[in-house]
């Protein structure tokens, strides 16, 4: 009887751990939809629309090679300064590698980005922390590192 109870506890614990690391299909698709929207906005040269994927808050953090930038406005300014025209922006594609739940309304996503440009192409890796607010997912932290 003790062996059955131990097995049952291990089984319940493993289900609990599994459920804590996997998002529902609906939440995963919602996050991917935001990324798709951002990709389309970027490829249209529209940084204003691209920024809709980020939480519009001073709590937003963007970390890149220049160190952390705090706040939605400062993050937008960084994008506008770094990508002043569509030639430098290029065509963006995302490749999602992993998406996991951290808590009920928080998830992280690891992926690669690729910029196809008439100048030099660029690619790199990113880790995004997402927060679900009033049923919508927003990026609250973005750490992006360029390989080129």
Language-model segment annotations:
Residues 56, 102-103, 133:
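Structural motif
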Residues 123-148:
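Short beta-strand edge/turn micro-motifs at domain boundaries
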Residues 1-23:
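Bacterial Sec-dependent N-terminal signal peptides
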Residues 55, 66, 98, 112-113, ...:
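A mature extracytoplasmic/lumenal domain signature
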Residues 16-53:
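Short, low-complexity N-terminal intrinsically disordered segments enriched in polar/charged residues
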Residues 38, 50-51, 59-60, 75, ...:
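Hydrophobic pocket/interface hotspot
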Residues 59-70, 84-87:
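A short gly/proline-enriched turn/hairpin at secondary-structure junctions
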Residues 76-118:
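Surface-exposed, charged secondary-structure patches
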């Amino acid at each position: 009887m003790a062996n059955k109870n131990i097995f049952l506890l291990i089984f319940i614990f493993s289900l609990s751990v599994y459920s804590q690391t996997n998002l529902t299909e609906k939440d995963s698709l919602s996050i991917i939809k935001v990324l798709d929207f951002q990709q389309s906005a970027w490829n249209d040269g529209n940084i204003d629309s691209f920024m809709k994927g980020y939480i519009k808050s001073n709590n937003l953090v963007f970390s890149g090679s220049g160190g952390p930038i705090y706040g939605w406005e400062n993050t937008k300014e960084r994008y506008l300064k770094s990508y002043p025209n569509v030639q430098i922006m290029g065509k963006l594609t995302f490749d999602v590698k992993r998406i996991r739940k951290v808590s009920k309304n928080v998830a992280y996503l690891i992926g690669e980005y690729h910029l196809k440009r008439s100048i030099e192409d660029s690619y790199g890796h990113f880790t995004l922390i997402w927060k679900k607010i009033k049923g919508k997912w927003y990026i609250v932290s973005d750490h992006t590192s360029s390989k080129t």
